Regions:
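C-terminal motif of bacterial Sec signal peptides marking the signal peptidase cleavage site
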Residues: 12-15
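N-terminal helix-cap/turn-to-beta initiation motif at the start of protein domains
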Residues: 24-40
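Bacterial signal peptide processing site
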Residues: 17-19
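Central antiparallel beta-sheet cores of small beta-barrel/beta-sandwich binding domains
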Residues: 44, 48-129
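Glycine-rich, aromatic-bearing surface loops/beta-hairpins
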Residues: 139-173
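Sequence-level preference for short, compositionally simple segments enriched
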Residues: 22, 60, 66, 140, ...
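A short, Trp-centered hydrophobic/proline-enriched beta-strand micro-motif
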Residues: 37-46, 152
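Sec-dependent signal peptide recognition
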Residues: 2-7
């Protein structure tokens, strides 16, 4: 029985030792974030609640610039109800596929990792809802399809409970 428990524990620990992003290491085309987020981009997206119901749609015009390992991505959102929002990301290429991101509504620092054609971000966003601000965790996955197109799917949660998903389609102009 002790051997069975030890084997089960070892199997569980080894399954936890590799990052989920590593499964994409061989996927092509390889994502060069500084190249993709350089220049003008356009995106279309939506938010769905945890039941899958469509809550909000939006369009985003973006401009990215890089100087060495430092980048800036200016995002201008227009939501389906006519409201507008701007977010400015300050990005840092830390090397070895690691990125950091900061924005005014991001609590702390977003941590990103690239493997193959996939980027996974983890961050907490201060999200205003009906006059209150909630800190919501994002598990954000970006999938490069070709040098002009990317699909982004982010899961939002609070206290470990899924709130919904954001889906975006990016196109370089």
């Amino acid at each position: 029985m002790k051997k069975l428990c030890a084997l089960l524990l070892l199997t569980t620990l080894s399954a936890c030792s590799s990052s989920p992003i590593e499964q994409y290491r061989q996927l092509t085309p390889a994502l060069d974030l500084k190249q993709f987020l350089n220049g003008d981009l356009e995106a279309w997206g939506q938010f769905q609640d945890r039941s899958g119901a469509l809550v909000k749609r939006f369009h985003v015009d973006m401009t990215g610039t890089w100087q060495g390992n430092k980048g800036e991505l200016v995002e201008n959102f227009v939501y389906d109800d006519g409201t507008k929002q701007q977010r400015i990301w300050h990005l840092t290429d830390k090397g070895n596929g690691q990125y950091e991101g900061r924005a005014d509504d991001v609590v702390g620092v977003a941590q990103g990792q690239i493997a193959g054609s996939v980027l996974n971000w983890h961050y907490t966003m201060a999200l205003p809802v009906n006059g209150k601000t909630y800190h919501v965790q994002f598990d954000d996955w970006m999938y490069l399809h070709d040098q002009q197109t990317m699909v982004n799917r982010a899961s939002m949660s609070k206290f470990g409970f899924k709130l919904g998903e954001v889906t975006l389609f990016f196109k370089k102009k």
